[in-house]
Amino acid sequence: MSENILQDLEMVTCTAPVNIAVIKYWGKRDEDLILPVNASLSVTLHQDHLRTTTTIACSRSFHKDCIWLNGKEQDISHPRLQSCLLEIRRLAQRRKNTGDPASDVSNKVHICSVNNFPTAAGLASSAAGYACLVYTLSQLFNVEGELSGVARQGSGSACRSLYGGFVQWKLGEQSDGKDSIAEQVASELYWPELRVLILVVSAEQKSVGSTSGMHTSVETSHLLKYRADAVVPGRMEEMIRAIRLRDFPKFGELTMKDSNQFHAICLDTYPPIFYLNNISHQIISLVHRYNQYYGETRVAYTFDAGPNAVIYSLQDYLPEFVEVVRHFFPPEVNEEEFFKGLPVCPADLSEEMIRDINMKPTPNGIRYMISTKAGPGPRVVEDPNLHLLGADGLPKKSAV
């Protein structure tokens, strides 16, 4: 396509964040609408360190919808992608019928998306990806209002990435899912001392995807039903209270207990699912020994459907814990490769602490770590030079 053919080209680029659940979503009561068996709650991470960037262009010259993810063309006919595209076009058409300006929804779209973190390795890439897709489509087609229900149809946890800070995904009661939406509990500025440390154990794609894993859990795990009915409702209330009171020991305890219960459900699934590996188990042990040394919860772990740990802590405690991780998982790469994100001050470790923790170091057990904090929801990228698609509507070399 030559550029003069695309005089009508419209293009929007946005970024969207990863969110990491502290009360986990695991299991659907409706596979088509992606309605959960339990409510969940997450922290939205800062986009300076983890984000999806998506450019969407539309033109009457495009013959079909296309999508490229991390430089590779993907199948646009995927049912979840189609659900999001159809729903946004339906909402845009409704606005157009009321006289609001909107791009021509009959025009085909080209979508180009990149993650600045490993895809499908348990770092919530689908949540950021679908949130970014829906938000960018909404900007392109001038769709306003509640979008989390649309993002949910792409990936359940994507609905939480449409807001910054602390976000709950409500269980909802309606069979059509209209009330199963995300809602902000507190903004990213509410608890400025909270810090997040991601310990990347493996960037490999997991052997059992979340979608198939949770389907098997719903079919076979009695513990899943017990958790949804008897545990999560009370735990959600406790977690929201801990966030509002900025009560880190309670926040940390609830976070770790919920992570453990999620992985217990994975073991209770038949056949069982193993997302954690030996390094994951060592990290769990390290966190508990570190907290025991101080007699209080200073750091807390959570693991999604993968071996990588997400550590929550407070600004004053994080520097020392970073050194603890370095000591017990000594890196075999340089500092720039091993530590990324928000800088932390150097800290010294006492011989007494190292002796008390009493763990054998595992060299190269952790590939790298990312230091970050809570951050805002999706944003529009104003600089046209940062578009991932060129004037011909095809991916730029930089996006491949």
Swiss-Prot record:
InterPro entries: GHMP_kinase_C_sf, Mev_decarb, Mev_diP_decarb, MVD-like_N, Mvd1_C, Ribosomal_Su5_D2-typ_SF, Ribsml_uS5_D2-typ_fold_subgr. It comes from the Eukaryota. GO terms for biological process: cholesterol biosynthetic process; isopentenyl diphosphate biosynthetic process, mevalonate pathway; keratinocyte development; regulation of angiogenesis. GO terms for molecular function: ATP binding; diphosphomevalonate decarboxylase activity. Pathway: Steroid biosynthesis; cholesterol biosynthesis. It is found in: Cytoplasm. SUPFAM superfamilies: GHMP Kinase, C-terminal domain, Ribosomal protein S5 domain 2-like. Keywords: ATP-binding, Cholesterol biosynthesis, Cholesterol metabolism, Cytoplasm, Lipid biosynthesis, Lipid metabolism, Lyase, Nucleotide-binding, Steroid biosynthesis, Steroid metabolism, Sterol biosynthesis, Sterol metabolism. GO terms for cellular component: cytosol. The keyword Lipid metabolism applies. It is an enzyme of class 4 (lyase). It catalyses: (R)-5-diphosphomevalonate + ATP = isopentenyl diphosphate + ADP + phosphate + CO2. Its main location: cytoplasm. Its EC number is 4.1.1.33. (R)-5-diphosphomevalonate binds at residues 25-28, 80, 155-160, 211. Belongs to the diphosphomevalonate decarboxylase family. Catalyzes the ATP dependent decarboxylation of (R)-5-diphosphomevalonate to form isopentenyl diphosphate (IPP). Functions in the mevalonate (MVA) pathway leading to isopentenyl diphosphate (IPP), a key precursor for the biosynthesis of isoprenoids and sterol synthesis. Homodimer. This is Diphosphomevalonate decarboxylase. The lineage of its organism: Eukaryota, Metazoa, Chordata, Craniata, Vertebrata. The gene is mvd.
